[in-house]
Amino acid sequence: MDFEHIPVLFNDTVNSLEIKPDGLYVDCTAGGGGHSHAVAQRLSDKGRLIAIDRDPEAIEVLKARFASFPNVEIVHNTFDNISAILNGRKADGIMADLGVSSHQIDTAERGFSFHMDAPLDMRMSKEGKSAADVVNTYSENELYRIIRDYGEERYAKSIAKNIVK
């Protein structure tokens, strides 16, 4: 599977970690592994990288990409569980490229892009309700609250009303 993603601020991000060869680093949103790969290449045998992602497709790509890196730990989880993932270990550096990845936007089946004719999904993984489920089953008030609170949209009431029409 091709998991093309253009990392944001690639060099700035990796350089700001000031990587120590024997350090412990965490990529909270590993995706296709671009940032992770740059970190892993700078580690010695004593160094460790933990690459976390919630997307099962990304996890498969990461497992293949880092198969020859024994000091890279691939974790299928969300970054909000970082304390449990670290399990008492102290990280020397943590990075997170938050948001939707290029791969997710460019893959029609993921349902993130309005440029392609595909079902409305918009999930980071296949767990939970799709965006289509939400807009087709939630009440106008529920949609209004979501759009207002998470989208910070001043026309949330009008948008919710038009969705349920």
Language model features: what each stretch is:
Residues 1-165:
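S-adenosyl-L-methionine-dependent methyltransferase catalytic core, i.e., the SAM/SAH-binding region
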